[in-house]
């Protein structure tokens, strides 16, 4: 089996910058140009959101993006088709950056677990992050994903106890994903001055109990915050801030240009 792109990336000694993007936001046709813009400007991994009508952990920015994506006809199947086009260089430069799909379990169950994984691998997906599927309840899912060569990522939060950090670290294929605050994504309520010390202690605790790499997300909006997170973790994830930057775009080309300019500002 060909080595997974994420597995290969995690062997490198570098700090990572991950992008989260909701397909076809804010306008239809934006996905492929945005993927190209993110790749050209140094995104190490691209997370593509799979929109769901009832997200439990998403803030207003991602909820709005998800609703618009759904209104633009985005489905799990259409996302896989877009990934396949991106990998083939159809409609954009050939995308070689690792792609991680992030979304809730219900659409995947409706699609059919093994069918979804087979189609995802065929399309060129490298990994999955399913927030509402805890590791304690996902041994079969994890085994199936690994049999297809897919990386699986699990979430750690500031209240995760040490023994569970070790479990999540063990079950995550290549890396785990740390939420920087106990809040929904993209709320803009991160008091960075007051939270820095708590986040630092939390990530030091994760470092103590995790053997694999971990990235941190939620509330990262600029170069200063990216570098702060790089001091404490192996990577930083920027999602809601990216969606906010491109939200006013009227065309796919404008969306890509806005994404490129913003991503350059983070490096």
UniProtKB/Swiss-Prot annotation:
User: How does the record describe its quaternary structure?
Assistant: Tetramer of two alpha and two beta chains.
Highest taxon listed in the record's lineage: Bacteria
* Pfam families referenced in this protein's UniProt entry, alphabetically: Trp_syntA
UniProt keyword terms in alphabetical order:
Amino-acid biosynthesis, Aromatic amino acid biosynthesis, Lyase, Tryptophan biosynthesis
The record's section on NCBIfam families has: trpA
| Pathway named in the protein's UniProt entry | Amino-acid biosynthesis; L-tryptophan biosynthesis; L-tryptophan from chorismate: step 5/5
Q: Which SUPFAM superfamilies match?
A: Ribulose-phoshate binding barrel
Q: EC number(s) per UniProt?
A: 4.2.1.20
Q: Which InterPro entries match?
A: Aldolase_TIM, RibuloseP-bd_barrel, Trp_synthase_alpha_AS, Trp_synthase_suA
- Function, as annotated: The alpha subunit is responsible for the aldol cleavage of indoleglycerol phosphate to indole and glyceraldehyde 3-phosphate.
| Phylogenetic placement of the source organism | Bacteria, Pseudomonadati, Chlorobiota, Chlorobiia, Chlorobiales
Family in the record = Belongs to the TrpA family.
Origin species, per record, is: Chlorobaculum parvum (strain DSM 263 / NCIMB 8327)
Q: What is this protein called?
A: Tryptophan synthase alpha chain
Q: Which reaction does it catalyse?
A: (1S,2R)-1-C-(indol-3-yl)glycerol 3-phosphate + L-serine = D-glyceraldehyde 3-phosphate + L-tryptophan + H2O
Which Gene Ontology molecular function entries are recorded, alphabetically? Answer: tryptophan synthase activity
Instruction: Name one cellular component (GO) term.
Output: cytosol
Q: Does the keyword Lyase apply?
A: yes
Membrane-crossing ranges are none
What are the catalytic residues?
47 (proton acceptor), 58 (proton acceptor)
Q: Write down the PANTHER family for this protein, in alphabetical order.
A: TRYPTOPHAN SYNTHASE ALPHA CHAIN, CHLOROPLASTIC, TRYPTOPHAN SYNTHASE, ALPHA CHAIN
